[in-house]
Curated annotation (Swiss-Prot):
It is an enzyme of class 4 (lyase). Pathway: Carbohydrate degradation; 2-deoxy-D-ribose 1-phosphate degradation; D-glyceraldehyde 3-phosphate and acetaldehyde from 2-deoxy-alpha-D-ribose 1-phosphate: step 2/2. It comes from Corynebacterium jeikeium (strain K411). This is Deoxyribose-phosphate aldolase. The keyword Lyase applies. Its main location: cytoplasm. InterPro entries: Aldolase_TIM, DeoC, DeoC/FbaB/LacD_aldolase, DeoC_typeI. It catalyses: 2-deoxy-D-ribose 5-phosphate = D-glyceraldehyde 3-phosphate + acetaldehyde. It is found in: Cytoplasm.
Length: 249
């Protein structure tokens, strides 16, 4: 594995992989508008908001992505419990896409992951993937803090087989906790074994063309060092609720 030189990682490179997130139930449209403005100014790659906040309307170019690129819009499905029927998750995801979402972060049935029931996970995730085919980006939240190593590896394999674009650690809402370096490292190791691990800094088009899968670490990433820890462990996206603080802006 290539040595990771933290000193060479730029603020711009990290900003480009940030999903600036606002999923609090009390968030208003004004709060979301402020999030979009800040994310745009910081050069973040995406914002992640609740489905009820869609559509967002006109979204300005994001500085880190070039003058012709716009901030990507992500939302959630089956959130935060994952205890929705598969068809409900799929319908929620498809409707969000119709309202302008570019990316869907869907929560798995964690009970199936705990049971290492790969068939159940596959059935659910394939249903959602079919509802939001490429070029829509599908990120699968596995709630990694609840899973032991083999359960986590099983979930990662199911995500890959179902055609997910990213495996995501956490909702950030479960009391078990959010992302950890250990969990991200396990996820990266499993993707590496499958020949599917996307490297840090790879563009979306290049990742899709190569058939690789990224890792989104989310939950508890509050500063620059924590962000670099996750990237070093294998994360290629970071979900954060305080992007300016993470970037030291």
């Amino acid at each position: 594995m290539t040595h990771f030189d933290r000193s060479k990682v730029t603020r711009e490179a990290v900003a480009a992989i940030l999903d600036a997130t606002l999923l609090k139930p009390e968030a208003s449209r004004d709060d979301v508008a402020a999030l979009v403005r800040e994310a745009t100014e910081l050069g973040c790659g995406a914002v992640c908001v609740s489905p009820s906040m869609l559509p967002l309307g006109s979204v300005p170019p994001s500085g880190s992505l070039g003058t012709d690129a716009t901030l990507r819009i992500a939302t959630v499905a089956g959130f935060p419990s994952g205890k929705h029927a598969s068809l409900v998750k799929a319908t929620e995801a498809r409707y969000a896409a119709q309202l302008g979402a570019d990316e869907i972060d869907v929560v798995i049935d964690v009970a199936a992951a705990l049971a290492k029931d790969q068939n159940a996970l596959l059935a659910e995730l394939i249903t959602v993937r079919e509802a939001v085919p490429h070029p829509l980006v599908l990120k699968v939240i596995v709630e990694s803090a609840l899973l032991d190593e083999e359960q986590l590896r099983t979930a990662v394999r199911a995500c890959v087989q179902a055609g997910a674009d990213y495996v995501k650690t956490s909702t950030g809402f479960h009391p078990a906790g959010g992302a950890s370096v250990e969990a991200v490292s396990i996820m990266a190791d499993e993707l590496r074994k499958l020949g599917k691990l996307a490297p840090f800094g790879m563009g979306e088009e290049e990742r899709v063309a190569a058939g690789l899968v990224g890792i989104k670490a989310s939950g508890g990433i509050r500063d620059w060092d924590a962000a670099l820890d996750m990237i070093e462990a294998g994360a290629t996206r970071l979900g954060v609720s305080a992007a300016a603080k993470v970037l030291g802006a």
